[in-house]
């Protein structure tokens, strides 16, 4: 992805071999130091997490998204879990929020841009809060991108919409998550027609707002946004059932080969608990143990 406001780290493949050797031994030294330090911490990685007394809490209700969800795929990959500890499967962001808000023992995950404080709260992860600054600098451990994809050539109106997303539309993206570039002036060519967009429930609110604002500029266009999940959206784009697919997960190699993609925003996966839960911070290691069914009660975190 082009680096604008979202920062990612890349490795230069042309580094001199001697530099690589120096870096190797520095890394070994840091590893040994961190190994010694790690034994003093509550968690196996990240910053120290202070866990309050949770003896009054009960069995953890582990809430996951459904198979095919881009949020689930990214969460599982980033945490390194097989999610065998899942108790409740929710097939949308709203259902995750509803489940966690109604159960003080529940834990779940949603798009940071969707967190609305309605009976739930987002936890810090490894001491880092999910916010625009930590996402922009890629400091929060559970960052991910929002992607629009298409197969083959776009229609004139779809091209015009994409031009809007890449320019003035970035101001709309900024209201939800971190944009990938500064907003720029957009001049529509006023192409007419319909654009079908399918996929991620996490990306859908942003894309729906982009569509709404674009149609104000170009009344000849009709942009239809249908929510399903990232995998379905990608498959629909591959098979020609829509003009654009929305994904909140990274593309598989074969998807990247067959589809043209554009990252239009950077977001994070927020870990949420009931607002009555006294926990404020959690480590990636703890999340893995919860979702792997190694921690089944809140008291296991201490």
Predicted regions and their residues:
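Intrinsically disordered, low-complexity repeat and linker tracts
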Residues: 3, 18, 187-190
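C-terminal motif of bacterial Sec signal peptides marking the signal peptidase cleavage site
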Residues: 40-44
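Bacterial N-terminal signal peptides that target proteins for export
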Residues: 19-32
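N-terminal cationic amphipathic segment used for targeting or macromolecule association
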Residues: 31-34, 45
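Exported/periplasmic ABC-transporter solute-binding proteins
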Residues: 45-302
């Amino acid at each position: 992805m082009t680096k604008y406001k979202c920062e990612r780290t890349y490795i230069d493949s042309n580094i001199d071999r001697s530099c690589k050797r120096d870096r190797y031994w520095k890394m070994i030294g840091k590893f040994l130091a961190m190994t010694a330090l790690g034994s003093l911490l509550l968690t196996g990685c990240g910053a120290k997490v202070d866990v309050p007394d949770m003896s009054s809490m009960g069995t953890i209700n582990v809430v996951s998204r459904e198979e095919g969800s881009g949020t689930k795929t990214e969460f599982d990959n980033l945490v390194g879990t097989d999610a065998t500890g899942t108790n409740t499967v929710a097939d949308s962001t709203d259902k995750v929020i509803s489940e966690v808000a109604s159960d003080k023992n529940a834990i779940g995950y949603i798009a940071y841009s969707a967190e609305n404080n309605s009976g739930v709260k987002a936890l810090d992860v490894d001491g880092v809060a999910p916010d625009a600054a930590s996402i922009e600098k890629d400091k929060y451990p559970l960052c991910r991108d929002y992607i629009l994809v298409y197969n083959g050539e776009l229609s004139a109106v779809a091209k015009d919409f994409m031009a809007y997303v890449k320019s003035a539309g970035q101001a709309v993206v900024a209201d939800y998550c971190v944009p990938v570039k500064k907003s720029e002036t957009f001049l529509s060519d006023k192409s007419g027609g319909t654009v079908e967009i399918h996929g991620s429930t996490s990306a859908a609110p942003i894309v729906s707002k982009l569509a709404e604002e674009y149609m104000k500029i170009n009344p000849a266009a009709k942009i239809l946004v249908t929510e399903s999940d990232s995998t379905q959206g990608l498959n629909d784009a591959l098979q020609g059932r829509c003009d654009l697919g929305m994904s909140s997960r990274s593309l598989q190699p074969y998807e990247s080969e067959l589809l043209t993609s554009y990252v239009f925003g950077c977001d994070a996966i927020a870990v949420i608990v009931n607002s009555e839960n006294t926990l404020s911070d959690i480590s990636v290691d703890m999340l893995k143990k919860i979702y792997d069914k190694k921690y089944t009660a809140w008291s296991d975190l201490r």
